[in-house]
């Protein structure tokens, strides 16, 4: 949400309750009751301490040595943002300068440094997912890490793996990698590894169930919608990518705005304490989304570690649920000292684990202004001023990776008569504003809150300013010697058509975050539906009525309906270029004119009609009471539901053509680890965690320092009368039902980052030889799907679990691809035993290999043979 959304919310939250010591907030008093659908989130206390895994041992040892000597003020400082507009970044914590810990800078976005300059605007997550290329996923993460580090950013607010794409109209689906748990998991994990290899803390988000933008937030008049998710669906679909992100060592998790099973994500003890920190072994820190904290004591007890941007119910008032109120809650005993110590230790341990105690730059940019100088704290009156932007160029040669991703993501859906690739001297007529520039200027719309010119990304906090943009119009004009351009969304009546002319029609479909409404779409695609914007369907039909050869180029945030024109005889080819970022033009012409064969594959299903989806995944509108978004479709999202309902889509998940052809041969399956039991072996025990004195600190530790120069509305940890706060310790805080300070037994499904380490034992390895049988060079993707036996109960008939992409193969050459399948990959979540259940020795499991979910080329049966289909 970030800065603009905070301003937009001020009016709607004006009558909200402000923070108060030891009190519940706007909505938290209601969160323990069951909702109308019967879903509830059982309590799980206390919050587990971090530091019990050997992979984080060194970082926690360093953090312990520092935290044990911190004052209460220093500890609180690191848990609470300084307030919106109270520093250079979209969020910053207070500091602990005695120990060398500065204000930690937190900044968007998953595709580039937001509200900055001289940075790369990479392709969006959905584009990266369409590459089905793990190396490019990792490379983008590395270069994002380099750029964020170069700007002095400690915490990158990405990647996004939630929403997962359950709702095809969902506004922020494009920030993630595709509508499948494994595709999201692999894309997220590779990105995290890349980012953190550069010493920047990655943040996996939004945890969890934020599948719709409208009504995601609570305010005084309306609770956020509740995503009602059963235990098995939660584990097998929505938690899957988070578990893999945690296994990759992610340093931070961001909670979602919405509720899950009637409890706000930022204070849902089941989600944070039990699942995230205990079962999945998360060792980093949990932060809120911006203004997504709804209570003070309640959120601390439930496992929240950092409040962002720090403000309470209404931003810019200088009030907070934490900050000085957290100091008060420690002094009066409402929040145990041990909980605060763990909160701070988690934050400091992540800082050490990324090596940020070394030569790490301070922020050298401002997300508040593009001017060189200005207020240091724009949210305050009479702020001191200084240099706020140093215009550090962090782009290096990252345009190469950006172009490669955008190019390798381009997905060829149709290519009748092999009309593509085009020849440089073909007579081209290019139509559509999506081919050209934004007439108002490159970055004229804040947070890309408009659809003008070529669509490079959606809108909202997940965006970045474009340092430059090569449009398709520019790139085509640079290559083609015979192209005419009609940058309009209305087909010109006076276009002359000659024999052999090719019409290239550009259309788009946009979406974004809820705080901006674009052309009647408040984030989600409410007005446009799944159709092209700006009369795109009509533009294609008009061109097809006049030209005998039409190529359609689609820039889209997700599934888009094509039925009005896809079967017209003149429509020869369709390319989906997704959201390509700054290299939109060059990446397209690389493929359009045949320098590269297209190798992208759909990261979602394209339906024939929106009615192909069940009503449960439609957008929900405002009722009189809280919206109940119940996941009645369960495990069956996207291609899974099409398979179950026996609905043939227009184009299936994973579909993507090439200018050449490929064969799959010599499939083999080998056993790596014998699965001798239904459930994994007993988890390893937890190791020791840091220990600290538990006595309540002296109140003087949060007294205002003498001669301290206060910044108005800046959030400090200090109290005017700390001694008085300590005296109120006799009052009993109304703790949530089920609250206890007695630790729970360790969940049997846990034991390491991501869960029981035995879950990630490689059970099988599958190899297949891919041969280029065509006449042009190209790359192929082998997609691996599992089919589980009936003995495990009802499961989707095919589930993507792995994929691999060849290098560029010359005609007649081959490459053998090998993919590994873990115990977890062939397991289901047992809701009774609360553990992952797999067939012994994998009996009955089938492993399918193909180029889409409906284009299978080979199959292996565990315990049987492999064969080519």
From Swiss-Prot:
Record InterPro entries: Cellulose_deg_GH3, Fn3-like, Glyco_hydro_3_AS, Glyco_hydro_3_C, Glyco_hydro_3_C_sf, Glyco_hydro_3_N, Glyco_hydro_3_N_sf, Glycoside_hydrolase_SF
One GO term (biological process): glucan catabolic process
Ranges of biased composition (kind: Pro residues): 681-691
UniProt enzyme class: hydrolase
Pathway note: Glycan metabolism; cellulose degradation
Chain positions covered by the region annotation Disordered: 677-697
Catalytic residues in the record: 289
GO molecular function annotations of the record: beta-glucosidase activity
GO CC annotations on file: extracellular region
Residues bearing glycans: 77, 261, 332, 364, 399, 478, 728
Entry's EC annotation: 3.2.1.21
Signal peptide: 1-19
Catalytic activities: Hydrolysis of terminal, non-reducing beta-D-glucosyl residues with release of beta-D-glucose
Subcellular location: Secreted
Record key words, sorted: Carbohydrate metabolism, Cellulose degradation, Glycoprotein, Glycosidase, Hydrolase, Polysaccharide degradation, Secreted, Signal
Family: Belongs to the glycosyl hydrolase 3 family.
PANTHER family in the record: BETA-GLUCOSIDASE, BETA-GLUCOSIDASE F-RELATED
Biological role stated in the UniProt entry: Beta-glucosidases are one of a number of cellulolytic enzymes involved in the degradation of cellulosic biomass. Catalyzes the last step releasing glucose from the inhibitory cellobiose.
Protein name as catalogued: Probable beta-glucosidase F
Lineage: Eukaryota, Fungi, Dikarya, Ascomycota, Pezizomycotina
């Amino acid at each position: 949400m970030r800065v603009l959304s905070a301003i937009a919310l001020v009016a709607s939250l004006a009558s909200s309750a402000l923070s108060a010591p030891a009190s519940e907030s706007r909505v938290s008093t209601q969160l323990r009751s069951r909702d109308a659908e019967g879903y509830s989130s059982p309590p799980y206390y206390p919050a587990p301490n971090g530091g019990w895994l050997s992979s984080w041992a060194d970082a926690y040892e360093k953090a312990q040595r520092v935290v044990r000597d911190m004052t209460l003020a220093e500890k609180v400082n690191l848990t609470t943002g300084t307030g919106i507009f109270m520093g250079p970044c979209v969020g910053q914590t207070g500091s602990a300068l005695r120990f060398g810990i500065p204000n930690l800078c937190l900044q968007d976005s998953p595709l580039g440094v937001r509200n900055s300059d001289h940075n790369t605007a990479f392709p969006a997550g959905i584009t990266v997912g369409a590459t089905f290329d793990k190396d490019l996923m990792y490379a983008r993460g590395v270069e994002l890490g380099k750029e964020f580090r170069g700007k002095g950013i400690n915490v990158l607010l990405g990647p996004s793996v939630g929403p997962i794409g359950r709702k095809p109209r969902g506004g922020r689906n494009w920030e993630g990698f595709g509508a499948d748990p494994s595709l999201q998991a692999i894309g997220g994990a590779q990105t995290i590894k890349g980012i953190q290899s550069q010493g920047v803390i990655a943040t996996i988000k939004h945890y969890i169930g934020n599948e719709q933008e409208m009504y995601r937030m609570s305010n005084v008049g309306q609770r956020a919608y509740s995503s009602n998710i059963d235990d098995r669906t939660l584990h097998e679909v929505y938690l899957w990518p988070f578990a893999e992100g945690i296994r990759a060592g992610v340093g931070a998790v961001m909670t979602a705005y919405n509720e899950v099973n009637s409890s706000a994500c930022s204070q849902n003890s089941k989600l944070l304490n039990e699942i995230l920190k205990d079962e999945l072994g998360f060792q980093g820190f949990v932060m809120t989304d911006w203004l997504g904290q709804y209570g003070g004591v309640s959120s601390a007890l439930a496992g929240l570690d950092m409040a962002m941007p720090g403000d309470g119910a209404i931003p810019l008032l200088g009030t907070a649920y934490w900050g000085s109120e957290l100091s008060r809650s420690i002094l009066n005993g409402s929040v145990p000292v041990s909980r605060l110590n763990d909160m701070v230790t988690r934050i400091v341990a992540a800082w050490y684990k990324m090596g940020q105690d070394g030569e790490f730059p301070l922020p050298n940019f401002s997300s508040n202004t593009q001017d060189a100088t200005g207020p240091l704290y724009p949210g305050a009156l009479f702020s001191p001023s200084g240099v706020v932007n140093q215009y550090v160029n962090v782009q290096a040669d990252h345009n190469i990776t950006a172009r490669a991703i955008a190019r390798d993501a381009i997905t060829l859906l149709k290519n009748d008569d092999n009309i593509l690739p085009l020849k440089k001297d073909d007579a081209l007529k290019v139509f559509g504003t999506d081919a050209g520039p934004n007439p108002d200027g490159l970055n004229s719309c804040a947070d890309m809150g408009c659809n003008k010119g070529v669509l490079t990304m959606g809108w909202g906090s997940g965006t970045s300013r474009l340092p430059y943009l090569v449009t398709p119009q520019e790139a085509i004009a640079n290559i083609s010697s015979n192209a005419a351009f009609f940058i309009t969304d209305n087909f010109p009546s006076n276009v002359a058509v000659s024999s052999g002319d090719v019409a290239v029609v550009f259309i788009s479909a946009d979406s974004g975050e809820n705080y901006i409404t674009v052309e009647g779409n408040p984030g989600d695609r409410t007005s446009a539906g799944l159709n092209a914007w700006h009369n795109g369907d009509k533009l294609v039909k008009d061109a097809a009525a006049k030209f005998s050869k039409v190529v359609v180029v689609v820039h889209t945030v997700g599934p888009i309906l094509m039925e009005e024109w896809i079967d017209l005889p003149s429509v020869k080819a369709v390319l989906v270029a997704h959201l390509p970022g700054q290299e939109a033009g060059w990446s397209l012409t690389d493929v359009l004119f045949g320098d590269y064969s297209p190798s992208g594959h759909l990261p979602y299903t394209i339906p024939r009609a929106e009615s192909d989806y069940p009503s449960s995944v439609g957008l929900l509108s405002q009722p009189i009471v809280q919206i109940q978004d119940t996941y009645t479709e369960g495990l069956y999202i996207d291609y899974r539901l099409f398979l179950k309902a026996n609905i043939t889509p227009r184009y299936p998940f994973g579909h993507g053509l090439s200018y050449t052809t490929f064969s799959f041969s010599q499939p083999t399956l080998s056993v790596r680890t014998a699965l001798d039991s239904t459930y994994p072996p007993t988890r390893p025990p937890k190791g020791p965690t840091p220990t600290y004195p538990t006595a309540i600190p002296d109140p003087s530790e949060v007294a205002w320092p003498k001669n301290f120069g206060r910044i108005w509305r800046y959030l400090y940890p200090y109290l005017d009368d700390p001694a008085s706060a300590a005296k109120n310790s006799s009052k009993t805080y109304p703790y949530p039902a089920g609250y206890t300070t007695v630790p729970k037994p360790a969940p049997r499904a846990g034991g390491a980052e991501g869960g029981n380490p035995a879950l990630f034992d490689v059970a099988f390895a599958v190899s297949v030889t891919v041969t280029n049988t065509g006449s042009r060079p190209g790359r192929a993707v082998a997609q691996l799907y599992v089919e589980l036996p009936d003995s495990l109960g009802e499961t989707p008939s095919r589930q993507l679990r792995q994929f691999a992409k060849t290098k560029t193969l010359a005609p007649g050459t081959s490459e053998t691809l090998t993919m590994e399948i873990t115990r977890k990959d062939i397991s289901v979540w047992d809701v009774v035993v609360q553990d992952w259940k797999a067939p012994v020795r994998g009996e009955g499991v089938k492993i399918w290999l193909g180029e889409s979910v409906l284009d299978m080329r080979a199959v292996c049966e565990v315990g049987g043979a492999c064969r080519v289909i």
